[in-house]
């Protein structure tokens, strides 16, 4: 831990990432507060503009769900937060949950090219920003389920894999 802190303190600050939790992160239930609050709109914009938008982005390969990270980050940087959420949720129907629980520091953020010299892009917080944006506004970014075709499927288990499978099958 101490070595990690020393390394992060020695990194150049020219590409310092903003870490300004929004006012929404303040909860009336202090024991229920999240450890890392959401980014404000301004902080999300600044953070997204730090991205290098790599051609063969290692963050995509490091993501277990294969989310196109540079695309959704670029959409946030251009103000298309709804489009960013669509990119995320099309690849991973549980993108809003994963933004909170996925160990991004060892997956996509751990693979971030920018992380070699500076702090990596806060991909998890940007993902959370985009998915929270559409959820808070009641915006539906996914296509409606396909019409019934007469086939029925039973999925055993209601964990992430079962829910993801059900969503994919409903689109067929």
Model-identified regions with their sequence ranges:
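N-terminal Rossmann-like FAD-binding beta1-loop-alpha1 element of flavoenzymes
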Residues: 152-172
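Ferredoxin-type iron-sulfur electron-transfer modules and their immediate structural context
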Residues: 2-152
